[in-house]
Structures are given as C-alpha cells and as structure tokens.
A protein has these predicted regions:
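Non-heme di-metal
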Residues: 1-185
C-alpha cells in the first residue's frame, strides 16, 4: 500500500546551525499539531469514511503527512549539525540530548513527548472532517509562527511549502465535508 520515494517532498538544505530553531521546529514532528499526529489521525479515520473517495483522500493526506514529518526531521537534524554539548546546553536542549543524543525524537518544543491523545477518530465522518479541518488550520498557524521566528531562507522556504500544504489539505477536507453534508451523512 505504501511506496517510499527516496526524496523529500521539498528539498531541505540548511547550511547554518540554529539550535533555537531546531528546538522550535521539532514541535511539528511530535507536537499536538505536528505531522506525526496528522498522519496517524487521518490514517485511523480513513477506515470509517463511508465512501472510497473519502478513504482514499484520508489515506493520501496521511501518507503525505509522513513525508512532511521526514522533512521536519531533516530540518531539525541539519539545524543541529555540528553542535557541541555546550551549545545544546545554551539552547536549552540538554534534556533532549540526555535522552536522545543527537537523535530525532517525537516531542514538542517544550520536550513533551508525542502521545496518541493528540489524535481523534470518532467513527463519524462529519465529526472527523471537522476535526481534520481544525487540525490543518492549527498546523498552518504553527508554521506561520515558525516562519515569524526564522531568519534563514533555507529554513523559511520549506516552512512556507509546509504551510501551503496545510491550506491545500484544509480545502480538500472542506470539499469532502460539504459533499458528505449534501449526501446526508
């Protein structure tokens, strides 16, 4: 069912270390409004969609969100590249380093680990799609905040791409939501 393409949906080539941005951006990997939560939410919900069209849409977007999580992980890894333990300490990343070294771990910018409580799957297509539209808007807002915090075009451009994908996903969910309402679901 899944096919892995060995390239990112958008190229990541960050040349400058920026540990504060790494700390902020990790939230889109393992935070409540991040890409892993979105992928699991949509993948779980697809099984209760009443039409093949709905199942396919949620599966397609879930798969895309996994690609976005890989982009975020690549960004964090590149932003941390070459950092000393002292630099990690100065950036407030010591607890991250203590538990995970230079590895990428699904948590938010405060170090709170990912939890399945971030996702919702009601078994009701209308409730799920409203949840999905809200999730995409929250992710869009987080990307806008990250863009505001960034000053490196190598960071800003992938964030702009990810922000735009949230808007596309919102619109796709809205189209399906409106279709289901018109069909009496």
């Amino acid at each position: 069912m899944f096919k892995y393409d060995k390239k990112l949906p958008y190229p990541i080539d960050i040349k400058n270390k920026d540990l504060k941005m790494a700390k902020y951006i990790i939230t889109q990997f393992g935070g409540a409004n991040g890409e892993i939560a979105a992928a699991l939410r949509y993948y779980s919900q697809k099984f209760s969609m009443p039409t093949e069209e709905g199942k396919a849409l949620l599966n397609d977007i879930a798969t895309e969100e996994l690609g976005h999580s890989e982009m975020i992980a690549a960004m964090v890894s590149q932003l941390m590249n070459g950092a000393s333990v002292k630099e990690l300490e100065d950036a407030g990343l010591c607890s991250q380093y203590t538990e995970h070294g230079y590895g990428i771990y699904p948590n938010d910018s405060n170090g709170v680990p990912f939890t399945a409580s971030y996702i919702a799957s009601m078994g009701d297509p209308i409730a799920n799609l409203v949840e999905d539209m809200a999730a995409e808007q929250k992710a869009r807002a987080v990307y806008e905040h990250l863009i505001d915090l960034a000053d490196d075009e190598d960071v800003i451009q992938p964030l702009l791409f990810l922000r735009q994908r949230e808007i596309v996903h919102f619109n796709r969910f809205k189209e399906l939501y409106e279709k289901y309402l018109s069909q009496g679901y």
